[in-house]
């Protein structure tokens, strides 16, 4: 198990003009993965058009209870704390 902090940006983190708008901490997560390719496309199709990642990459955090939190990876940074 590990603790992580997720910083959320107002746009694509690869753009120097993006700024942090939120910060969330998760304690005792089971794991995480960054999903790209076909699986990321499937995730994008399950969300509304405004929630899709421009770079087709998603961060999935598996919580202690088995639930998951999914983020547009190009809009967040995750740090182990």
Q: Can you annotate each of these PLM segments?
A:
Residues 8-10, 63, 80:
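Residue-level signal for short segments within beta-strands and strand-turn junctions
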Residues 16-78:
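Acidic, low-complexity, intrinsically disordered interaction modules
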């Amino acid at each position: 198990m590990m603790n992580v902090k997720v910083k959320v940006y107002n746009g694509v983190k690869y753009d120097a003009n993006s700024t942090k708008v939120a910060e969330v901490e998760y304690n005792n997560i089971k794991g995480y993965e960054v999903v790209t390719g076909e699986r990321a496309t499937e995730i994008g199709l399950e969300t509304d058009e405004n929630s899709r990642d421009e770079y087709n990459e998603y961060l999935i955090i598996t919580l202690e209870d088995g639930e998951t939190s999914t983020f547009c990876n190009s809009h967040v940074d995750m740090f182990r704390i």
